[in-house]
Amino acid sequence: MKVSKVYTTIDAHVAGEPLRIITGGVPEIKGETQLERRAYCMEHLDHLREILMYEPRGHHGMYGCIITPPASAHADFGVLFMHNEGWSTMCGHGIIAVITVGIETGMFEVTGEKQKFIIDSPAGEVIAYATYRGSEVESVSFENVPSFVYKKDVPIKIDDYEFQVDIAFGGAFYAVVDSKEFGLKVDFNDLPAIQTWGGKIKHYIESKMEVKHPLEEGLKGIYGVIFSDEPKGKDATLRNVTIFADGQVDRSPCGTGTSARIATLFEKGILQKGEIFIHECITEGKFEGEVLSVTAVHTYEAVVPKITGNAFITGFHQFVVDPRDDLNRGFLLG
């Protein structure tokens, strides 16, 4: 056996959505900011993403993360997230998983019963709080970047369907649409059709307009499409599934997507500051969200959302790359 690369990871999940934290085998990542570091990874380290996200080591729905030194003087650390299509700008379930793994494995030092973390992400600064007993994390909450409605009631015409979507930012840009527009429910049976519509809507919007953050050039494009539905759980407010990247299905309620959804509900007067919003996902998992404060991003009214969830470690792994293997960089099916 020949080995050219060895990577170590800690894997976890949040409401079924995986996160693979790469703990060994990562070379130096250059850049002063997390956006610059993300750009560096896109240009120089995409092979690492393919090796660890793609089959046979990963799968179409795999999500990953690299923990970096902080980019700002007051942050505790930085994060860079990856998926089946590339490198994302922020990931809410990823924040929940990183904090949980960091505390439960002793990677992060904690004192008392609640710990605050300041995290640099490509989308901006994120503040997270962990509640734990001993080495077991009970929940993680994070204050996300300012989230806002970019455009509302955007008309869409695809095939014989005409409908409207809201476009909102919650760390990445999302199009929000009701699943009933297509006669679909957010469940496993309708998931293939929802995936197809997610791709169509994303491509339609990006062919008609440029979606770009008013302050950060590197934050642009539709990351995902949120399909909203009536909840199944008695305590849930709404049910959703997010289709993002290259048709990837978010098993969790989607942290940045929930932030974008909170922004749309607040803008419409449906959700008030301090009111609890329970977002249910296709696996029946839930995130708790609320509006902490109201602010502005350039000319847009924005909210600072707080999202709460929990994560569980699923494994500790060591992956190798054999240079003789024709599939050593991986492949994707589905």
Swiss-Prot record:
It comes from the Bacteria. Its EC number is 4.2.1.77. The active site is at 91 (proton acceptor). One of its GO terms (molecular function) is 4-hydroxyproline epimerase activity. Substrate binds at residues 92-93, 250, 255-256. Keywords: Lyase. Gene3D superfamilies: Diaminopimelate Epimerase, Chain A, domain 1. SUPFAM superfamilies: Diaminopimelate epimerase-like. It holds the Pfam family Pro_racemase. It catalyses: trans-3-hydroxy-L-proline = 1-pyrroline-2-carboxylate + H2O. Belongs to the proline racemase family. Catalyzes the dehydration of trans-3-hydroxy-L-proline (t3LHyp) to Delta(1)-pyrroline-2-carboxylate (Pyr2C). Is likely involved in a degradation pathway that converts t3LHyp to L-proline. Can also catalyze the epimerization of trans-4-hydroxy-L-proline (t4LHyp) to cis-4-hydroxy-D-proline (c4DHyp) in vitro. Displays no proline racemase activity. This is Trans-3-hydroxy-L-proline dehydratase. It comes from Bacillus cereus (strain ATCC 10987 / NRS 248).
